[in-house]
Amino acid sequence: MVYTGDADGRCEIFTWDRSTGTGRQVTDRPHGTLLCAIDADEAVWWFDEDRGGSGRWRTQPFDGGPDRPALTGVPYGRPAGLALGASGTVAVGIRSPEGFGVHLGRPGGAGATVLRTTDSATLCDLAPDGRLLAVSGPAHSARAVTLLAPDGTTVAVLSGTVERTWALGFAPAPAPTPARGPLPVPGRALLLVMRERAGRYHLGTWAPGRGLELLPWCSFATETTARWYPGPGGPRVLLRQDRHGRSRLFTADLDRRELTPVPTPEGSILDAAPAADGDVHVIWTDAVNVPRALSLSGAPLPGQSRWRLPRFGHRQDLWTPGPDGPVHTFVTTPADRSAPHPLVFLVHGGPADHDRDAYDPMVQALVGSGCAVARTNYRGSTGYGPRWRAAYSEGVGHTQVADLVRARADLLERGIGREGAVGLCGTSWGGYLTLLAMGTRPDLWDVGVAVKPLADCVTAFRHSTPALQALDTALFGGTPDEVPDAYAHASPSTYAAAIRSPLLVVAARRDAKCPPEQVEAYLAVLRAGGVAHELMWLDSGHDGYDGADHLAVIRRSLRFLGRGLPAAPVPAEPSPHAERR
């Protein structure tokens, strides 16, 4: 297997040979490496990206050796999908300034361009026999899933305009037999699909000549993803459900039409992969255990050392009444201090994401300094079903701020926090909500930290990627030229001059998701309005892989929050772990 692990504070690629229990480090780059895979010939694939997130795929033998270009002739750009076929064919999705492209070939050979488009798209998978590619568009679009032949001919299109639809991957090749050999049987492509229908997520399959068939016995009330089991036996699928900030696993036997729970420790499963021998490997965490690899059979895996934090606070789940249902908040309070406490809302990113029962170094550091911490899964968060995720009744951003305001009032009424000592801290979309809340309700928040935020919606759209432009167009109901009032109403820059509390803005010079140009536009409004603020620039992209940058942000954020919250002592040495993302 190959995986991403820690190397002196950086993300790097490693191998692990289960038969010998040994591994090695594959990459060693100054600013880290994140993406990796392993192909049918056991070659390690890794994405050689620059600090702005653009690059090319390279390969290296599993046991070591020189790095080589994975496919020649592929444009330099951002990764947008990798599919490694059992037949030896590979497909690469790349986003470049010219648009999105899919390139097909043999490892080390030339990549033939199968698709080129300016639309938002991602390569999902390649059928085992190499005869079909699945390309994902926005789940709500007319081309939610496009099936292509190797020459680029469109074979089928699945629309998501009525019911959101997305592809999850082709079934693996059947196990080899003496008569058939190791190659996949041609023409037996079976694509796993998820479709949102009547407030639930329904698993289904698509096959040539048969079309899409949903499985009525396999549906879920909250967000769920799935992967095929490899190896012998009938078609089986491993499903991972996110529900109310925690995870559950199931196995679906498609022949028997049976759904069986898979026992797991309580907490959050960040990823789960079935192994060929029927075992399941997961990345598991909870509030006091850092993420680590686990084998549900108990087999040894890399990164299984147990690092459980000492008890650093009291944890509880609170539910606050709201117009579209109760709002769920994870609350952690100091165990050795009496309430009410200074209170910090850690606002999660997304918007299609959620806070969960998982280790967060910021929670540990803030609670250790005497603060209570609230992590609210406002409307728009995943893990609570389609209706909750789509609830924007009070407008983009303002709906989420309204839920933060309700949770704040509830926590103060319960005596957990206290008036005059309530702060906000968020990254990306969480940074956006921090800025919007600080500007629209300046009377409620006493300090704020916005890390790599969306700060000016119109400028962000102009300088963003096609994928994020498509997201904004769906979220706002059009482009800034088509619905300018909607963008202005949701933009933190509209309200920036109203901020009255201390504000720290952390931004990245190479950020493609929350571009520096829109942060500069927001800062100009702050300066014009005479709003006092502090600024920290990073020479990185949106998702930095260097722990030194994350540690610097944690230090600066904790000290800034400590100064802005009365009776919250400034920590002398914050937790030296990765920044919340």
Give, region by region, the residue ranges found by the protein language model.
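Non-catalytic accessory segments flanking enzyme active sites
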Residues: G55, P69-L71, P79-L82, I94, ...
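Beta-strand C-termini and the immediately following turn/loop, strongest in propeller blades
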Residues: V2-D8, D17, D39, V44-R51, ...
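Residue-level recognition of beta-strand->loop/alpha-helix junctions
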Residues: T27, P216, N377-Y378, W537-D539
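Conserved hydrophobic/aromatic "anchor" residues
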Residues: Y3, I38, L84, L126, ...
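Active-site-proximal cap/loop segments of hydrolase catalytic domains
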Residues: S381-R581
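Multi-bladed beta-propeller domains
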Residues: W16-T33, P61-R78, G105-T122, P138, ...
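Cap/lid segment of the alpha/beta-hydrolase catalytic domain
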Residues: P302-R414, R418-G420, T427, R462-H463
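Glycine-rich, N-terminal phosphate-binding loop and its surrounding beta-alpha-beta segment
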Residues: R29, T33-T59
